[in-house]
Amino acid sequence: MRGGATEPGPMERVRALCLALPEAFELETWDHPTFRVGGGRGKIFCTSAADGSTLTVKAEPAEREALLAQGDPFYVPPYVGGKGWVGVRADHRRTEWEEIAELIATSYCLIAPKRLARSVTSPPSLDG
C-alpha cells in the first residue's frame, strides 16, 4: 500500500466482510467476535478468533466436504463441526479473501431470514 499505510489484518477483513451484509451485526460471545443476523441476539453466521486468524462458517454439505478434502486452510471446527460448519485458517499470506468472502456470504444466506438472504446477489467486497 502507498503512503506507509498498512494493510488490514485478518480480523479487520473478516469484520468488514461480515458487516457488509444486510442487517449483520457483531456481538462478542465466548471471548471472541460472532457475526449475526436477525432479531434479538440474532443467529450466528460467522465466528472468528479475536485476532481473525481463524473463522467458522456454515456450508452446504457438498461444499463442506469439498473444502475439508482440500485440507489446510480448511478444518473441522470444535463444537459445531458436526453441524455443517467448517473452519478456515485466515492468518497466512496465501489467504484467498475472495473465497472467504464467498464462504461468509453462503453462510449468511443459509442462516439469515429468507427476505435478507434473497437480497445478497454477490459476496461482499474488501474494495469498499
Task: Label every model-predicted segment.
Residues M1-G128:
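Charge-dense, helix-prone N-terminal extensions
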